[in-house]
Amino acid sequence: MSCVPVRGCRIGEGRPKVILPIVERTEAAILEKAAAFSTLCADCVEWRVDLFDAAADPGAVVRCLAKLRVLLKEKLLLVTLRTKEEGGSIPVSHEGYLRFLRTVLDTDCADLIDIEFFTAGTDLPALVQDAHTAGVKVVCSSHDFHKTPPKAEMVSRMVAMQQAGADLPKLAVMPQSRSDVLELLAATAEMTDHHPETPVITMSMGPLGAVSRLCGEAFGSAMTFANPGTASAPGQVGLDVVNTVLDSLRLN
């Protein structure tokens, strides 16, 4: 599996990198959380902008983003506007989504930006190019909160993300059975073994899929989300547990 270097962090190499989500609604609460996260044992902080009360105000987003960058110091900053269709909090038009992405890219504050595979559609390659021109790595994401697609479909989707130029394909799916969790892990292993051009980020959601968030080094998921107190998705595991288990399951 290849490696994506960002701020001295080598995503895809060794222990899965840990992401902490900021899900607070006000700027004051967001910045307070960022200051607390800056000292925790994690590699990356995700700001879920769709949960921000002022998400529709580009100026407020830019101002908050600049303050976040300072507070987080050398921790990676992943910026995400999760659309309602993919489990987020606010409806956003296609044009509004594109404007948001370009606003973030113009700030020089984000290390990584989440671009939804289906929301971006045919604009995905151009958006990836814009991000790379701005020096920002792309997490290209797809979420299914109802089911787990067949393995071949999951692999095909992540390969399509790679072909569009994404640095980190991300797939989150909901299991309805134990077999679904195994299907997600098998898709992850296939990407690692047969499509190693990029690292991938995968997870099976909910309590049934929680194990998939902890065994990334064995199966090939390069990053995992931990719950620092408030989860941003079902099945996220507490930060202390994540760090303990990731250390226990080290391959080297």
What is the predicted role of each segment?
Residues 2-7, 14-17, 198-199, 219-221:
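Generic structural motif recognizing short loop/turn segments at the entrances and edges of beta-strands
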Residues 1-5, 238-241:
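Short N-terminal or domain-adjacent regulatory/targeting segments
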Residues 3, 10-133, 143-147:
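Active-site beta->alpha loop and helix N-cap motifs at the rims of alpha/beta catalytic domains
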Residues 112, 117-252:
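Catalytic alpha/beta core domains of metabolic enzymes, predominantly
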Residues 7-9, 213:
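A generic local secondary-structure boundary/capping motif
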